């Protein structure tokens, strides 16, 4: 007969918390367990925290596009515009599972930045000074930006293949940094865990989501 091993029941204490970072203390934990537990938690946070990103674009009036297509009157090609859009910080409230469509409609000469993006009421651009492209002379542009919610790094081939839309490889992860250190005592340990996001999601929610994910995977009876 195998007897149940005595164990601690840890408690989480929030030490610091602001709009894009959180530091918590988790303890008490068994000796030599904190490092393994922290690494698992770190992997879950990086891989399974969802974020919002631009996955592709469409130039209205042009039916066939590819990554190296030139945009009439625009200094950058499609690939360069998409690369600039990868740095867009998008915050969404009350996601209704409808397609995320943003638009840019401008006439040149003009330097287009993220503040020029027209968004639905439930979407906010946090970095509104991000450079996107330059319109030359009297050219006009009418872009539709396609966004999506996802986790981790996703290749463009996942989103499909349409002649009128160019998709790009996308990193949905809103996590900038995760670190930890262990306080060791005679009979137990404490784990100090730190998370920093890009500002598009609440770090407290990130922590709760990671523990919920972990609970779903290990709460197995047999």
Curated annotation (Swiss-Prot):
Keyword list, A-Z: DNA-directed RNA polymerase, Mitochondrion, Nucleotidyltransferase, Transcription, Transferase
Enzyme Commission number(s) of this protein: 2.7.7.6
Pfam families: RNA_pol_A_bac, RNA_pol_L
GO biological process, one term: DNA-templated transcription
One GO cellular component term: DNA-directed RNA polymerase complex
Record has Cytoplasm as a keyword: no
UniProt main location, coarse: mitochondrion
Tagged with keyword Mitochondrion: yes
Listed GO MF terms: DNA-directed RNA polymerase activity; protein dimerization activity
Gene3D superfamilies found in the cross-reference section: DNA-directed RNA polymerase, insert domain (2.170.120.12), RNA polymerase, RBP11-like subunit (3.30.1360.10)
Superkingdom of origin organism: Eukaryota
Top EC class, one word: transferase
UniProt function note: DNA-dependent RNA polymerase catalyzes the transcription of DNA into RNA using the four ribonucleoside triphosphates as substrates.
Family the UniProt entry places it in: Belongs to the RNA polymerase alpha chain family.
Protein name: DNA-directed RNA polymerase subunit alpha, mitochondrial
Organism: Reclinomonas americana
């Amino acid at each position: 007969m195998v007897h149940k091993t005595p164990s601690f029941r840890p408690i989480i204490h929030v030490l610091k918390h602001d709009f894009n970072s959180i530091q918590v203390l988790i303890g008490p934990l068994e000796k030599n367990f904190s490092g393994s537990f922290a690494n698992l938690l770190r992997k879950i946070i990086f891989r399974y925290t969802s974020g919002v990103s631009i996955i592709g674009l469409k130039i209205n009036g042009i039916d066939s596009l590819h990554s190296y297509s030139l945009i009439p009157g625009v200094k950058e090609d499609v690939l360069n515009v998409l690369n600039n859009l990868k740095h867009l910080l998008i915050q969404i409230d009350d996601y209704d599972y409808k397609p995320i469509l943003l638009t840019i409609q401008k006439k040149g000469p003009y330097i287009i930045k993220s503040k020029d993006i027209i968004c639905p009421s439930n979407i906010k651009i946090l970095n509104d000074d991000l450079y996107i492209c330059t319109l030359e002379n009297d050219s006009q542009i009418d872009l539709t930006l396609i966004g999506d919610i996802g986790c981790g790094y996703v290749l463009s081939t996942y989103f499909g293949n349409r002649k009128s839309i160019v998709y790009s490889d996308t990193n949905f992860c809103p996590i900038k940094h995760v670190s930890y250190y262990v306080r060791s005592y005679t009979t137990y340990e404490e784990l100090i865990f730190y998370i920093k996001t890009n500002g598009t999601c609440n770090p407290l929610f990130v922590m709760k989501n990671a523990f919920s994910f972990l609970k779903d995977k290990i709460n197995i009876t047999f």
